[in-house]
A protein has these predicted regions:
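Flexible, low-complexity linker and terminal segments
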Residues: 1-182, 187-191, 196-200
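Thiamine diphosphate
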Residues: 192, 201-226
Length: 226
């Protein structure tokens, strides 16, 4: 989940709650503990599952084609990139919206590309989907139009497609700065305060712990992940 989704809010439509059936758990270390011997025996199962998922990807409603009025460009995207595309282009261009990107639907992508003159992959950061499409023998554009650094935006999509960027609106007043800090009452604050006083070199981990690196605690020197 990308930051723009995780740190956002919007109006949603709710449906009736669906209770999945309870499934009994059976202990099976050979299945759930992937020590080398078990991992070798389970690897064929993983490959079989991926093949089944590849078939599922072709028909699942998670991956869908949305028609457009101008087939000169076909856009392939997923996640927030899809929302940027729809807000920037509306229903002008056909869109292949991928809700499942591994395994990717090969036949669906090829059929979509056959119906448009030019295929553009819109995705943030590395060109994962673009590389897959190129591997299928398609002439696609992606990172030649979009940066592999930072976030996308509606205007970034517009500029890449030769459209006029939308005008922005500046705030009349500056928003008060709110630097990241651990929440009041967080028990980690006391720990990091003590580590700071001891002047230790501390290797942290992902999550809220990273906030221990900023002032006034300044207690973490590195993180293992993220």
């Amino acid at each position: 989940m990308c930051t723009r989704i995780a740190h956002s809010q919007s109006i949603v439509e709710t449906a009736a709650r669906e209770e999945p059936p309870a499934r009994p758990y059976q202990k099976d270390a050979a299945k759930y503990v992937m020590m080398p011997g078990n991992a070798k025996r389970r690897h064929p199962v993983v490959e079989e599952r991926l093949l089944a998922l590849a078939d599922y990807a072709e028909t699942t409603p998670l991956n869908r084609v949305e028609e457009g009025s101008d087939a000169s460009i076909g856009l392939i995207c997923s996640s927030t990139a899809y929302q940027y595309v729809k807000e920037a282009c509306g229903d002008r261009y056909p869109v292949l919206k991928l809700g499942m990107i591994h395994p990717l639907p090969k036949r669906l992508i090829l059929d979509f590309a056959a119906g448009v003159k030019r295929v553009v992959v819109v995705e943030e950061l590395d060109g994962f989907i673009e590389a897959h499409c190129s591997g299928l023998g398609l002439a696609v554009e992606g990172k030649s139009l979009f940066s592999a650094i930072g976030e996308l935006s509606q205007n970034a999509v517009r500029r890449a497609l030769g459209m006029t960027p939308a005008e922005g609106r500046d705030l009349e007043e500056s928003i008060p700065p709110r630097p990241p800090v651990m929440c009041a009452g967080c028990p980690h604050r006391g720990l990091f305060y003590t580590l700071h006083k001891l002047n230790l070199t501390v290797l942290g981990d992902i999550g809220c712990y990273t906030l221990g690196a900023v002032a006034p605690l300044s207690a973490i020197d590195s993180t293992i992940c993220m």
